[in-house]
């Protein structure tokens, strides 16, 4: 099973029982689909995997939720530390001078904290410090410039829920878990049944250092789902401060869609983080990434342009050898992913399983 955060004997036993049931159903069905999730770092691949667990497995156990609680605490602490550091670098002052001391206390106490130290609820002191800081207009001004530095997409969501998350009995909701940021390392497999098909989904780390592992997953792939973060058209890579993230995704997609390993493989493009893109495109023009773009500023026109740019990278389209099936997605929206994955499954059945006697 693709459970990254399971801990304890109960969770292990539970996972083994699910795996056994899936194998039994697979033996009865006889149809197996291998899905490979690829894309640059922070494109939303791991969130898609969590949605598959919610939609097609059994969600998350209490132990897993507790593990995610520590991740969420860490995300929030790291986000605030980043904002404090960047405020100094950008010369942004706290509107309330008392909050400068709050920032000093926060940084000195929690700069070196690790996930292992976050099994308990936020202390009252820490919660109050974060509330004070998040309420400061200077902090908000810095946050609004987050495209200039590396900050989790979930920062605003979590801090706007700080009262709830600070409760001693806090247990992450489904939405909280979907927004948790965990860097993918290695290869994580998630198995599930859907429409009488046994799916094996592989999530592979998207950072440059992780991509050398991709080749080990290429054999026998039924379909590739390539994730692109639409919202990153104006941002730089964490690993390369010069490289535009969208351009990096384009280069990566070019190398995948035209790869000899995938000549007979369905290629599905998820243009993800549509919700963030819709907000950002109102303020930041698309030609910051594509200088040649002369179209309008509407969400529809700009997103369709990005889709066309990626689809044109498919060099086999002109010979009718390979079609790229594109979908606009919001990986944190369960209803959206339910609808999109249903369409994806139909594509896979129609174009990749004809020889398996399904229809």
Curated annotation (Swiss-Prot):
List, alphabetically, the CDD domains matched: G-alpha (cd00066)
Residue span of region G5 motif:
329-334
Region listing for G4 motif, in residue ranges: 268-275
Residues bound to GTP: 39-46, 178-184, 203-207, 272-275, 331
Region annotated G1 motif sits at 34-47
Q: Where is this region: G3 motif?
A: 199-208
Query: What Gene Ontology molecular function terms does this protein carry?
Result: G protein-coupled receptor binding; G-protein beta/gamma-subunit complex binding; GTP binding; GTPase activity; metal ion binding
* GO process annotations (BP): adenylate cyclase-modulating G protein-coupled receptor signaling pathway
Q: Where is the lipid attached (N-myristoyl glycine)?
A: 2
- The UniProt record lists the G-alpha domain at 31-359
Keyword terms, alphabetized: GTP-binding, Lipoprotein, Magnesium, Metal-binding, Myristate, Nucleotide-binding, Palmitate, Transducer
So where does Mg(2+) get bound? Answer: 46
Q: How does it assemble?
A: G proteins are composed of 3 units; alpha, beta and gamma. The alpha chain contains the guanine nucleotide binding site.
What this chain does, per the entry, is described as: Guanine nucleotide-binding proteins (G proteins) are involved as modulators or transducers in various transmembrane signaling systems.
Give the UniProt family note: Belongs to the G-alpha family. G(i/o/t/z) subfamily.
Descriptive protein name: Guanine nucleotide-binding protein alpha-4 subunit
Which species does the entry assign this protein to? Answer: Caenorhabditis briggsae
């Amino acid at each position: 099973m693709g459970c990254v955060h399971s801990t304890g004997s109960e969770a292990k036993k539970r996972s083994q029982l699910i795996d056994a049931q899936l194998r039994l159903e697979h033996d009865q069905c006889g149809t197996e689909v291998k899905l490979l999730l690829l894309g640059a770092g922070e494109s939303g691949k791991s969130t898609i995997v969590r949605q598959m667990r919610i939609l097609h497995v059994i969600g998350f156990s209490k132990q897993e939720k507790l593990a995610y609680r520590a991740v969420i605490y860490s995300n929030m602490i790291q986000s605030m530390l980043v904002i404090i550091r960047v405020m100094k670098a950008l010369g942004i002052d706290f509107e309330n001078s008392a909050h400068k001391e709050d920032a000093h206390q926060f940084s000195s106490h929690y700069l070196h904290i690790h996930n292992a130290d976050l099994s308990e609820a936020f202390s009252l002191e820490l919660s109050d410090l974060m509330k004070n800081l998040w309420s400061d207009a200077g902090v908000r001004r810095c946050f609004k410039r987050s495209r200039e530095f590396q900050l989790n997409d979930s920062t605003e969501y979590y801090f706007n829920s700080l009262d709830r998350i600070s409760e001693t009995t806090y247990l992450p909701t489904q939405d909280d878990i979907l927004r948790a940021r965990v860097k993918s390392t290695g290869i994580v497999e998630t198995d599930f049944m859907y429409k009488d098909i046994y799916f094996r989904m592989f999530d592979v780390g998207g950072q440059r250092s992780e991509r050398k592992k991709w080749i080990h997953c290429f054999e026998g792939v039924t379909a590739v789902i390539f994730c692109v973060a639409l919202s990153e058209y104006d941002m730089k890579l964490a690993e390369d401060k010069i490289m535009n993230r969208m351009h990096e995704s384009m280069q990566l997609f070019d190398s995948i869609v035209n790869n000899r390993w995938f000549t007979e493989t369905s290629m599905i493009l998820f243009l993800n983080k549509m919700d963030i893109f819709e907000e950002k495109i109102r303020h930041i023009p698309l030609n910051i990434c594509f200088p040649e773009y002369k179209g309008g500023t509407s969400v529809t026109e700009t997103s369709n342009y990005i889709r066309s740019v990626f689809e044109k990278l498919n060099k086999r389209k002109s010979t009718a050898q390979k079609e790229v099936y594109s979908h606009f997605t919001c990986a944190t929206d369960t209803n959206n992913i339910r609808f999109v994955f249903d369409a994806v499954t139909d594509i896979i059945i129609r174009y990749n399983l004809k020889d398996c006697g399904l229809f």
